[in-house]
Amino acid sequence: MDRILARMKKSTGRRGGDKNITPVRRLERRDAARNINYDAASCSSSSAEDLSVSTSSLMTRSLEFPEPTSFRIGGGVGEMDRIYRSLGVSGPDDLAISFDAWEACKKRSSSDVVNRFKSFDLDKVRDQDLSEEGPSGVVVGSDSMNHKVQGQDLSEAGPSGGIVTELSEIGNLITPVDRLVADGVVENRRVMERTPTIVKSKGYLVPNNVVAVGVGVGGGIKGLRPPVLKPPPAMKRPPIDHRGSSWDFLTHFAPSETVKRPSSSSSSSEDGCDEEEGKEEEAEAEEMGARFIQLGDTADETCSFTTNEGDSSSTVSNTSPIYPDGGAIITSWQKGQLLGRGSFGSVYEGISGDGDFFAVKEVSLLDQGSQAQECIQQLEGEIKLLSQLQHQNIVRYRGTAKDGSNLYIFLELVTQGSLLKLYQRYQLRDSVVSLYTRQILDGLKYLHDKGFIHRDIKCANILVDANGAVKLADFGLAKVSKFNDIKSCKGTPFWMAPEVINRKDSDGYGSPADIWSLGCTVLEMCTGQIPYSDLEPVQALFRIGRGTLPEVPDTLSLDARLFILKCLKVNPEERPTAAELLNHPFVRRPLPSVGSGGSGSASPLLRR
């Protein structure tokens, strides 16, 4: 305890003693040693020398670094000046060349190779007598243009029995002279001035500034070598053998057979030829049924071919057209305005060299990817089918032509467009719908009798001419029906028949599917809107698959309603054929008489 108290006293004493400690004495100028002999000038000079030495050493060290080979421009002041100084120029003007120097450089670079050979008149050399031939088979001749080149006197002895070429000057020409020494020693002399010669060896005829010596020349290159290489042969495109190639199909769309022109024989012989060709076409149509394969979905989804809409007019020559009987020959034509878009591409108006108007379906086959093969097959089927159809209610096919990557299909021009555009402009009354329906039935009957199914009957695919004639168009999905075995789901959903949607539950579908689509088309013309218009396409598919009929308004006439409901039978076996529907009262009614021009009665086509 005593020890602890003693330590506490000592620590307290230390703390108190710290306050009495005197601070360290500060150094002041008066305490510095006085140097009376101090010279400020000498001190400043010595310090300047030391500074210069240190600066020079730093500069010497900085020069030891390698010069920069790349520069980074950060936008600072003076960066470009440092780059110019490192390049040894004062500014950007030193990097430029004059216009005259540039033009001279271009002329020199383009004429170095070409003009060198133009200076030699090869045609004249062929007509001249060439000099004698040495043992190596090399023939040396002089050129008509003698450009003298400085040389040197070369004299050396060749082996025994050799032939040496000696150049002798006659006027302005230098001609080779072969001289054989009597004792077998060959002497080779060359004058100081020589001219370029034409050397012909192994099929080459090239200019050469070197005199060819047969044998016995010591040193250098032995024999003759032309100064330029023989150009390679022209490259040829490899033949297209791949069966899946788009170009292979494209080249076969417009066959190169002899163009069929109208014969000058009598009308009776023409009728006989037409009958024979018609029988051949029917036989080909039957054979096509076994070769057709299922095609892709609708054109809007799978076959949206591209086109150049900006090109309003262009002239295209028809390279290899094919023509049906009675069609005019189209040798040259011009593409006009865009009329619309079909299953495979854009449709334009065209005019031939004879002033005949027609429709041109332009198909591009380049950027289709995986869908190209399917669309090409679909297009090939349409062309083959159209070439066999000859009916007043079906669009007439007039031939094909190709131009680069595009295929052009020439069709009959129907001026008023589709029924879709027509009922959007006018209100179609029952009398007009009845007239149009009868013509549609005539075309369908012709197709079904031929064994074809259209598979896409709707107002957008039915065209109207100025005289009121209705024509079926867009046969991109049409198929040959054989034993009711069409099992693919094609067409637009709103016009599809139930058996087309429920193809798994049936063996396929045939011509009754077109009758269902016809009923939907008549309903569309009467109401001015598509069937199932209040549903989405997927919802419409489910409704149709379950057998739900589209709504038929009570405002329609009784004959029109009965005709539509007769077509829209869920069971395809209960639907009438096209021939039976032609006897229906709706299509057999007479047209009401339109009032005379003075009565002022409205046209039945005019929308009120």
Swiss-Prot record:
Q: What is its EC number?
A: 2.7.11.25
Briefly state the modifications made to the protein after translation: Phosphorylated by CRLK1 in response to cold.
Q: Where is the composition biased (Basic residues)?
A: 1-13
Q: Does the keyword Kinase apply?
A: yes
Q: Which residues carry this modification: Phosphoserine?
A: S62, S603
Q: How does it assemble?
A: Interacts with MKK1, MMK2 and MPK4. May form a ternary complex composed of MEKK1 and MKK1/MKK2 and MPK4. Interacts with RACK1A, RACK1B and RACK1C. Binds to CRLK1.
Name of protein: Mitogen-activated protein kinase kinase kinase 1
Q: Which organism is it from?
A: Arabidopsis thaliana
